[in-house]
Amino acid sequence: MATIAQRLRDDHGVAASESSVRRWIATHFAEEVARERVTVPRGPVDAGSEAQIDYGRLGMWFDPATARRVAVWAFVMVLAFSRHLFVRPVIRMDQTAWCACHVAAFEFFDGVPARLVCDNLRTGVDKPDLYDPQINRSYAELASHYATLVDPARARKPKDKPRVERPMTYVRDSFWKGREFDSLAQMQQAAVTWSTEVAGLRYLRALEGAQPLRMFEAVEQQALIALPPRAFELTSWSIGTVGVDTHLKVGKALYSVPWRLIGQRLHARTAGDVVQIFAGNDVVATHVRRPSGRSTDFSHYPPEKIAFHMRTPTWCRHTAELVGPASQQVIAEFMRDNAIHHLRSAQGVLGLRDKHGCDRLEAACARAIEVGDPSYRTIKGILVAGTEHAANEPTTSSPASTAGGVPARP
């Protein structure tokens, strides 16, 4: 109406108020106005068949723990038959909070309704659609655990869940206004008490003067789905793209995946202390959860890319022991001081066995020790020249060539 009135003033010079425009439309388009206002009454709802869920803003709260003012929202679940409700104040509305509120509500009711009618929040619905909504994976996992159905309301249609929309003002006025809380936990416990002792005992005209709590106890409680024997483990899902370092970001941490998945978008499931990464329905990596930093499994890299990291000083000592005593002595010299700085040289010496064999490498190491220069370059030169069994000393590199190794110690 405001837009029409503004256009009349700007484009046609007609000084018409919004109320005048509204009366004119009601007079000349009475049938269209009446058609738009028609509502179809819902039939009766069976006990235990439906719960309606939504968030409503309560207000600002000073948190003594952080000395900051934060916004507080109320998670509200209303059983459509008895009108019995559950309220849980929260300061976060992420996936974990959304699912945790559902778990608390089911425990409060000691059962699960057959259908959950929720708003199209991203924590519950990834892609709203009238006929085939895409449910968030964490929420779908919760629904599967409790054997219930998620049935999102139509987008921008609050009348699809009037049982939870109407009590929001009542919750804010009766529970929240004029009260002070020392902690979020105290606030949540107070909300549970209020839901039972205040909201549950009010008389409702919609229930023909009955009280929601009494209606719930008498009829609806036994109609709810029983709670499963195993408690639900809170999970969160995220999606990201694998970087060229083979890591995927989950929260504030990075987790490695097999290198062949570089550039692909993968889903990550976080539950407790475990992070699982999925390609489709297959688990491709599992890590211990970290608050930040990197969690790297070197088996996710091509072998040639991780040789330095996999062939540790311990590996070098063990491999040299398998080759022979002379090789073991050479590697021990490398590892005696500043092992990490001489690791490349030790890896290089042991790598010569791939081309020349263990016997020749052992003989070359013995010859290098004999001439007093057991460096990588000298050992390689002996093998290339084929003089590891020569009676006379082979020609060795200049002293400067020992920079890549560690000379023998007296």
From Swiss-Prot:
Gene3D superfamilies: Ribonuclease H-like superfamily/Ribonuclease H. Coiled coil: none annotated. Residues 40-220 form the Integrase catalytic domain. GO terms for cellular component: extracellular region; plasma membrane. SUPFAM superfamilies: Ribonuclease H-like. Pfam families: Mu-transpos_C_2, rve. The keyword Mitochondrion does not apply. Keywords: Transposable element. The keyword DNA damage does not apply. GO terms for molecular function: nucleic acid binding. One of its GO terms (biological process) is DNA integration. Residues 390-410 are annotated as: Disordered. PANTHER family: TRANSPOSASE RV3428C-RELATED. Belongs to the transposase IS21/IS408/IS1162 family. This is Putative transposase Rv3428c. The lineage of its organism: Bacteria, Bacillati, Actinomycetota, Actinomycetes, Mycobacteriales.
